[in-house]
């Protein structure tokens, strides 16, 4: 690990010992590789786990490549018993989050653990001690590495594969975390529906709103990518500002996320709503590339040959479901049905493009306005994710 990387990864001065369990900080690239690959041990026989791309995980956790690290400190910990890795956790101080919310919160995330409460307790003790050492008063998570990325622990809905950029974990994680003294902070919902036409009444209301509104709905123009990203960014920061857990993305973070997602975007499913040229809402629906990534076991190449890449290209043609991953409306335009218009238009386009159905995720459990809209569109709630909290003291 480079000197710059070491400076970005804070750690306690000595290993934490808990009986036969030793928790140590990740301080070099080799340990970071072990940290990432430990997931394969946990999910070895799990039918629903989708292995992440190893290349992407290394880039995500590399402070020199991920702009999140410009305003955050991240400590990665590995738990070992008799030299064998049995757990991992990340502790995060996001200075932008704490500044925005005037709080002293540490995230925890990237949690993986064998089914042993002593191992889990040792990992959370390491995270708590790290956070206390930085003057932080509470833990919140799982966040991988913030609410702008993967969020929450799956607590309901273990019988199907996760969609792209949604979390997945063994059912026993919730019990482990609660036995370590954490409690519920917030639940998040995921919803599913087929690509069948929207309910007649819902569609009729949305069509009437659209016909009598000066709002125009259009597809994102990827040939004018940077300008479109600027418009979406404006809506994103305004629409989500009051949401629980929200933290504004920096310019560099948003631009990187946009570049990363561009390869997955189908222009017909990336919608902007505008009024007299002003962007007021947007929705983003992407094909569920997890259906293809599941076939790769985390690798695009094998022995230098692009075997994984060829598999990805082949199975990408067979993707038959989508994920509506973002839908936001500026505050001054809410309760005018713009969200319903975007949902109906998305459903129709998904059907026209030949997909079989998809997921809407995630929504806050207490966001009644958007949850009612999603339910009225014919969606059924299929998964529940939980964010936990605890004091560091």
PLM region spans:
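Acyl-donor binding region in acyl/amide transferases
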Residues: 98-181, 297-377
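Catalytic cores of nucleotide-enabled group-transfer and carboxylate-activating enzymes in metabolic
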Residues: 25, 29-32, 45, 51-63, ...
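TRNA-binding/sensing appendages of the translation machinery
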Residues: 3-5, 15-59, 128
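Active-site proximal loops enriched in glycine and acidic residues that flank catalytic Cys/His/Asp
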Residues: 248, 274-275, 283-289, 325-331, ...
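Flexible loop/turn segments at secondary-structure boundaries
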Residues: 32, 95-98, 147-149, 198, ...
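Acyltransferase donor/substrate-recognition loop-hinge adjacent to the catalytic core
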Residues: 9-21, 167-245, 269
């Amino acid at each position: 690990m480079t000197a710059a990387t070491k400076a970005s990864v804070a750690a306690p001065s000595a290993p934490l010992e808990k009986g036969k369990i030793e928790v140590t900080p990740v301080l070099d690239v080799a340990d970071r590789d072990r940290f990432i690959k430990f997931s394969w041990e946990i999910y070895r026989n799990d039918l629903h786990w989708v292995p992440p791309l190893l290349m992407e995980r290394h880039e995500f956790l590399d402070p020199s490549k991920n702009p999140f690290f410009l305003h955050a400190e991240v400590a990665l910990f590995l738990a070992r018993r008799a030299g064998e890795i049995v757990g991992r956790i990340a502790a995060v101080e996001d200075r932008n989050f704490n500044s925005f919310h005037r709080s002293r919160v540490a995230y925890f995330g990237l949690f993986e653990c064998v089914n042993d409460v002593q191992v889990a307790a040792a990992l959370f003790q390491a995270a708590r001690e790290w956070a206390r050492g930085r003057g932080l008063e509470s833990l919140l998570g799982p966040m991988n590495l913030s609410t702008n990325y993967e969020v929450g622990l799956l607590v309901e809905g273990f019988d199907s594969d996760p969609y792209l950029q949604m979390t997945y974990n063994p059912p026993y994680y919730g019990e482990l975390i609660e036995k370590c003294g954490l409690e519920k902070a917030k639940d998040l919902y995921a919803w599913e529906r087929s690509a069948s036409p929207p309910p007649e009444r819902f569609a009729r209301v949305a069509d009437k709103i659209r016909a009598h509104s000066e709002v125009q709905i259009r597809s994102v123009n990827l040939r004018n990518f940077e300008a479109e990203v600027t418009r979406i960014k404006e809506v994103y920061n305004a629409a989500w500002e009051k949401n629980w857990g929200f933290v504004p993305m920096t310019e560099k973070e948003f631009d990187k996320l946009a570049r990363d997602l561009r390869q997955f975007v189908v222009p017909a499913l990336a919608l902007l709503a505008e009024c007299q040229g002003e962007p007021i809402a947007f929705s983003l629906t992407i094909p569920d590339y997890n259906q293809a990534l599941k076939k790769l076991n985390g690798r695009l190449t094998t022995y230098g040959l692009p075997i994984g890449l060829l598999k990805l290209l082949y199975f990408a043609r067979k993707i038959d479901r989508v994920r509506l991953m973002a839908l936001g409306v500026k505050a001054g335009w809410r309760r005018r049905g713009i969200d319903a218009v975007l949902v109906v238009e998305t459903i129709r386009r998904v059907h026209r493009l030949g997909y079989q159905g998809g997921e809407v995720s995630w929504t806050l459990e207490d966001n009644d306005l958007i949850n009612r809209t999603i339910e009225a569109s014919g969606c059924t709630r299929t998964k529940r994710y939980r964010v936990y909290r605890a004091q560091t003291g």
